[in-house]
Structures are given as structure tokens and as C-alpha cells.
Amino acid sequence: MRLFTTGSTLPDQSTWFADPGTYPFWEHAAARNIPVCMQMKTQAIPLLRQIMDRFPKVIIILDHLSRAPVADGPPYAAAAEFFALAKYQQLYLKVTPINVSPKSWGNGAPETFFRKVIEAFGASRLGWGSNFPNSIGTLSEILCAAREAFSVAKESDRDWIFGKTAQVLYPCLAK
């Protein structure tokens, strides 16, 4: 299941996903072990925490890493609220071309940012998504850029990021 709460066609951050009227949806997703992919900005993290606290069995996939800010560089203080989400074991992260090639890394760099993401969340909670065909480039080019961004990661971590995590979230992929 995917919940689109912001994006190119909806630039403002919606808050409806945390409305009490949605609680039956969250209960259903938790009871049926249905992963819920959230496309949202970091400003909605407090609402996401409320949902994860209320429904600790629901599996959440945070799309585009919620566009965590990277321009300040190490130690990525501007992304502190994002990194604080690591305590939620039900939370997984989807890394996309938006994260691999942000418009402005500023003082940040893929090597230092993704190393910190892996240290905080663990590679088994990260999964790569191509965002194809909406991303610029061929699928091969998009994959190559992602592999380059994670070249500092251990091979076993890359195995999780580029396949095993998806198989955990969607067991039919492991068959």
C-alpha cells in the first residue's frame, strides 16, 4: 500500500494520514502485515511517530528517506529528526534517485550520509527503489548511480539494500 501525502502533484504536506478516521486502515494494515509506503516530507515526522506509536505492528516504508536534508554535511544535524526514527523497528527506508543524486549535496556527500544511515538503521531496513520510469535516465544508469552511492558499504550491506530487504517486505519476491 502506498500513501501519497506530498509530491510533484501535491506540493504541500498533507496530514490526513494521522487523522483518527484513518485508524481502521492502520489496524487493517497491521493485522494483515501489509507494508505501508509513506511518501512524505520530514515536516510530517511527528505525525508519523504518532502513527507508529499507536500502531507498533504496522510496517512503514519511508519513501525517499522523507527527503532528509543533507546539505549541512556531517554530522547531518539538520536530519536529526529523521535519524531519531531509527528506534522504530517497524520502519524501513526506501532509497531512490532523489536521495542518491540530490540537487545539492552542499557539504554532504553520499559516502558520509549513507554510512550514517546504515549505522543508524541497519542495512536490513534499507531498500533501493528505482522510481523508474519517473526518474531521469535508463534503469541501468539509475542502478549504476545507486550502486556508486553505496560503494562505501560492505558487500553484505549492499546485498540487503539491493534485494534482501525487498524480499523481507514482500516475501513473494523471495520465491
Report the location of each language-model feature.
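Active-site gating/metal-coordination segments in enzymes
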Residues: 1-43, 50, 92-99
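Short, acidic/turn-prone active-site loops that include or flank metal/cofactor-
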Residues: 5-8, 64-69
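Distinct, well-ordered alpha-helical segments
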Residues: 13-19, 42-56, 71-84, 104-115
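Short, well-ordered coil/turn segments that N-cap beta-strands
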Residues: 30-35, 56-59, 87-91, 122-126
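Conserved anion-binding
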Residues: 39-40, 61-65
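Active-site metal-binding loops of divalent metal-dependent hydrolases
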Residues: 65, 130-132
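Short beta-strand segments
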Residues: 94-97, 128-129, 162
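Mid-to-C-terminal alpha-helical segments outside catalytic/metal-binding sites
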Residues: 115-116, 121-127, 134-175
